[in-house]
Structures are given as structure tokens and as C-alpha cells.
């Protein structure tokens, strides 16, 4: 199966109450919206959780394109993670990688599929990214 996933995270304060949202489209363009929240979190944790929860909804061995407006998520999974693992989950500055627990989960889930990561500009003309943002923002208060 082929899927497109649009993800977003939001936080009211950083840290503070946060929400995540994702729009999952299958190859026939059937749409599933998912969202959730945490009481005390950060925007980066919500961005990561949006991708994690979306990937959990998809069967293994699928072709997936994930669209995120988070440079942190895109660069983390496509560039930085290889170095972090080699350095024992430490950054180039020898500090512990923030959100290591979520990075590990995301890495495990993406390995079960063929995932391509794409960055999209937030708050622009992409209706599915805007919907993911809306889901994340609404989830903060639920």
C-alpha cells in the first residue's frame, strides 16, 4: 500500500500543554485524521509524536511519504540520527539527545516501511498540512 501522511505538533507555552495531529491518505485518497495531546510537553515532542502515531496506524511494508513542517523532525530522522547513534545518543556537543525515547520509537516504526521524508512550509497553501495543524491546535484543549 502507498500512503501520504501530513503531521504537525503544537504547544501552548514551551513547555506547556501540547497537541499533535496527522492526516493519513491512502492510495485511493481515503482520509483518516488522528490527534492527541499531553498536559506538559514541548512542540518538538508533539511533532515527533504526530509522526509516530501516524506510522502506528499503517501496516508494515508500506510505501509512505511523510510531510512535516518541522525541520527538527526531517533533519533528525534523515541526517542527525545516524551520528547520534554512533555517538551513543549524544549530540556533536557531547550532550544527551533530547527526546531520545521518541526518536528511538520513530526509528523502529520507519524501519518497518519504506519512508520518504519531505519538508513543507507551515501555515501555507497545503490544505493537508493546514488540517494537521488545525488538528494539533484543537487537540491542545481536548
Residue ranges and their predicted role:
Residues 46-47, 128:
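Hydrophobic (often cysteine-bearing) scaffold residues that line and stabilize catalytic clefts
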Residues 10-17, 52-131, 135, 140:
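RNase H catalytic domain
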Amino acid at each position: 500500500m502507498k500512503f501520504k501522511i501530513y503531521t504537525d505538533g503544537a504547544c501552548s507555552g514551551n513547555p506547556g500543554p501540547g497537541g499533535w495531529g496527522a492526516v493519513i491518505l491512502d492510495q485511493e485518497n481515503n482520509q483518516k485524521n488522528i490527534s492527541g495531546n499531553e498536559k506538559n510537553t514541548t512542540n518538538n515532542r508533539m511533532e515527533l509524536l504526530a509522526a509516530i502515531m501516524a506510522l502506528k496506524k499503517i501496516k508494515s511494508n508500506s510505501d509512505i511519504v511523510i510531510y512535516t513542517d518541522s525541520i527538527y523532525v526531517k533533519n533528525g530522522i534523515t541526517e542527525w540520527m545516524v551520528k547520534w547513534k554512533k555517538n551513543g545518543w549524544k549530540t556533536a556537543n557531547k550532550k544527551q539527545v533530547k527526546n531520545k525515547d521518541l526518536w528511538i520509537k520513530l526509528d523502529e516504526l520507519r524501519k518497518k516501511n519504506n519512508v520518504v521524508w519531505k519538508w513543507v512550509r507551515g501555515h501555507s497553501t497545503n490544505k493537508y498540512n493546514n488540517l494537521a495543524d488545525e488538528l494539533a491546535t484543537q487537540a491542545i484543549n481536548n
